[in-house]
Amino acid sequence: MPATVICPSRAEEKLLRKQGFILIAGLDEAGRGCLAGPVVAGAVIMPPRLKGDWVEMVRDSKVLSPAKREYLYCHIVSMAVTFGVGAVDNEQIDSMGIAPATRLAMKQAVEDLTCQPDFLLVDYLKLPDIPLPQKGIVNGDALCFSIACASIVAKVSRDRLMSKLDMEYPGYYLAKHKGYGTALHVECICQKGISPIHRRTFAPLKGMIDGL
């Protein structure tokens, strides 16, 4: 029996608008657990009224096919009040750790918006460095419409970046696995070595380095 796919709701946004908040931004990240490349965050402010079949297709980016993510990305960025993207590279991730790096990418994404939101809906995290009212929602990318939209923006933005890095660092098949720790990726690292865009503090790469 196939797993049930949750349809994100706009209940949080509706409740916040009743409380007087207008510019409500959803925030999510992509690439947190990868072995290579940056962690990327998306921030999106969607208008309260949206029409079109695509609206009902929005889901957590992880359950969508690449083609559907691209399709939805185009609608989201064209209909958004504003959207922003932040990225923190592998060297910064190794230096500060993935949790602070993720928060920094989210802060960058908020700063990339063309207008300041008055409330943030964040997938799971709290962002103490951003002095705005906010709410962290567990599984927010599956449950909350604005966060689901942000997850798609983050994922598509990162996937496009990894496809570019694939041309700069051939032989790792980055466009295929997007830097995640697949068997193919680990095999390529074993054969070619660790590249300048790999996260050296992440297992199994740290073990490879420590074993040298």
Swiss-Prot record:
Cofactor binding: number and manner: Manganese or magnesium. Binds 1 divalent metal ion per monomer in the absence of substrate. May bind a second metal ion after substrate binding.
Q: Which PROSITE patterns match?
A: RNASE_H_2
Q: Where in the cell is it found?
A: Cytoplasm
Domain spans labelled RNase H type-2 = 22-212
Q: Which domain of life is it from?
A: Bacteria
User: According to its UniProt record, which cofactors does this protein need?
Assistant: Mn(2+); Mg(2+)
Entry binding sites for a divalent metal cation? D28, E29, D123
Single Gene Ontology BP annotation: mismatch repair
- EC number(s) on record? 3.1.26.4
Q: Which UniProt keywords apply?
A: Cytoplasm, Endonuclease, Hydrolase, Manganese, Metal-binding, Nuclease
InterPro entries, from UniProt? RNase_HII, RNase_HII/HIII, RNase_HII/HIII_dom, RNaseH-like_sf, RNaseH_sf
**GO molecular function annotation:** manganese ion binding; RNA binding; RNA-DNA hybrid ribonuclease activity
Catalytic reactions on record: Endonucleolytic cleavage to 5'-phosphomonoester
Q: What class of enzyme is it?
A: hydrolase
**GO annotation, cellular component aspect:** cytoplasm; ribonuclease H2 complex
State the similarity comment.
Belongs to the RNase HII family.
The cross-references to HAMAP family, in alphabetical order and at most eight, read: RNase_HII_B (MF_00052_B)
As for what it does, the entry says:
Endonuclease that specifically degrades the RNA of RNA-DNA hybrids.
Q: Per its record, how is this protein called by name? A: Ribonuclease HII
The gene that this protein is the product of is: rnhB
